[in-house]
Curated annotation (Swiss-Prot):
Keyword Cell wall biogenesis/degradation listed: no
Family: Belongs to the RbfA family.
Keyword terms, alphabetized: Cytoplasm, Ribosome biogenesis
One Pfam family of this chain: RBFA
Primary role: One of several proteins that assist in the late maturation steps of the functional core of the 30S ribosomal subunit. Associates with free 30S ribosomal subunits (but not with 30S subunits that are part of 70S ribosomes or polysomes). Required for efficient processing of 16S rRNA. May interact with the 5'-terminal helix region of 16S rRNA.
Protein name according to UniProt: Ribosome-binding factor A
An annotated GO BP: maturation of SSU-rRNA
Amino acid sequence: MAKHRSNRLAETLKQEISQLIREELKDPRIGFVTVTSVEVADDLGNAKVYVSVLGDSQQAKDSLDALKRAAGFVRSEIGKRVRLRHAPEIVFKYDTSIEHGAHIAQLLRGVKQEEEKDEGESHDQ
């Protein structure tokens, strides 16, 4: 039961925090940020918000720093928007899964090209 509730809250937080970042946060350091997932502790006291940032590593670092500084504001807004007795503590984390997936895709393309090259050479002989 508690897991179901935390999953439901995680999805709600993802939507609300995405909207807050898009519409309310005016920090110029925040670039094109996407909330990829939210993990809420079973006691609903903490929420890890995973974000990805479009741009280079410096833009990602700047955006994450700005989000961390705005965590208190985000928490207070969540408390107003979502009916909870206590709003969870918000912690922003950089999500590297998209970069990791792109790296794996690049490696797979390289393997495929090598295989095609090897097949082409074996047919020539």
